[in-house]
Amino acid sequence: MICGIDEVGRGCIFGPVLSAAVIFKGNPNFLNELDDSKKLKKAKREYLSSLILENSYYAFAEVSNETIDKINIHHASLLAMQIAYEKLDINCDLVLVDGKFIPKIKAKKIQAIIKGDSIINEIKAASIIAKVQRDKLMDEYNKIYPLYALNKNKGYPTKEHKEAIKKHGISNLHRRSFKFI
């Protein structure tokens, strides 16, 4: 079995970093439609996400903004990947992670692949479901913190988001360790 892992929200200034781990059940017929989540339109991501969830074993993990501020975004991203894999509770022959760093995962073989979210189907799938999951989370947070337009910026440091912070201050879910904050 091959497990693909990716994270989303690394460059955000609001909320958690979120990771997903994916193992396909068999060989689904939609694999040729997969791509890096950043290259797909929202409707396509959501469509593929539902197919991925139906045809895979998967797990999500979030690492909070408080933890990000304590251990830094790099270590928080690796921790989210580690937790997502551990939550799967399936021993894999091969674990492939997006990027150049390897989280602390106990597996027979683990490999980091730069641009893996554009190359490896399992990582592409993890990228897609992680992005859809985090976007939904930001839509929910937008109901609590409407001043920051999280439904539009998804927690990223857009011009409007930065202006809202200047005008209203930061919330308890903003990452205080980031330069702009």
UniProtKB/Swiss-Prot annotation:
Root EC class: hydrolase
CDD domains listed in its UniProt record: RNase_HII_bacteria_HII_like
InterPro entries assigned: RNase_HII (IPR022898), RNase_HII/HIII (IPR001352), RNase_HII/HIII_dom (IPR024567), RNaseH-like_sf (IPR012337), RNaseH_sf (IPR036397)
UniProt-recorded Gene Ontology molecular function terms: manganese ion binding; RNA binding; RNA-DNA hybrid ribonuclease activity
Record-annotated RNase H type-2 domain positions: 1-181
Coiled-coil regions, chain positions: none
Catalysed reactions, as listed in the record: Endonucleolytic cleavage to 5'-phosphomonoester
Co-factor note (free text): Manganese or magnesium. Binds 1 divalent metal ion per monomer in the absence of substrate. May bind a second metal ion after substrate binding.
Cofactor(s) demanded: Mn(2+); Mg(2+)
Function as written in the Swiss-Prot or TrEMBL entry: Endonuclease that specifically degrades the RNA of RNA-DNA hybrids.
Protein name: Ribonuclease HII
UniProt source species: Borrelia hermsii (strain HS1 / DAH)
Classification lineage: Bacteria, Pseudomonadati, Spirochaetota, Spirochaetia, Spirochaetales
